[in-house]
Amino acid sequence: MKIFFAVLVILVLFSMLIWTAYGAPYPVNCKTDRDCVMCGLGISCKNGYCQSCTR
């Protein structure tokens, strides 16, 4: 059971790392540039979506 939990934690950490490096796997809606802070610094809101998070 400990091995299963350890593998699960590793998978979660890697998925968070990939999300951080490549943006969110889904389009992030926004109204202002402040809504895009989770996508990284300096990311702008264009056409209602954070540009870096919609690759």
Curated annotation (Swiss-Prot):
Keywords: Disulfide bond, Secreted, Signal. Residues 1-23 form the signal peptide. Disulfide bonds join 30-45, 36-50, 39-53. Expressed by the venom gland. Its main location: secreted. One of its GO terms (cellular component) is extracellular region. It is found in: Secreted. Negative results: does not show any effect on Na(+), Ca(2+) currents, nor on voltage-gated and calcium-activated potassium channels. This is Neurotoxin BmKX-A1-S31.
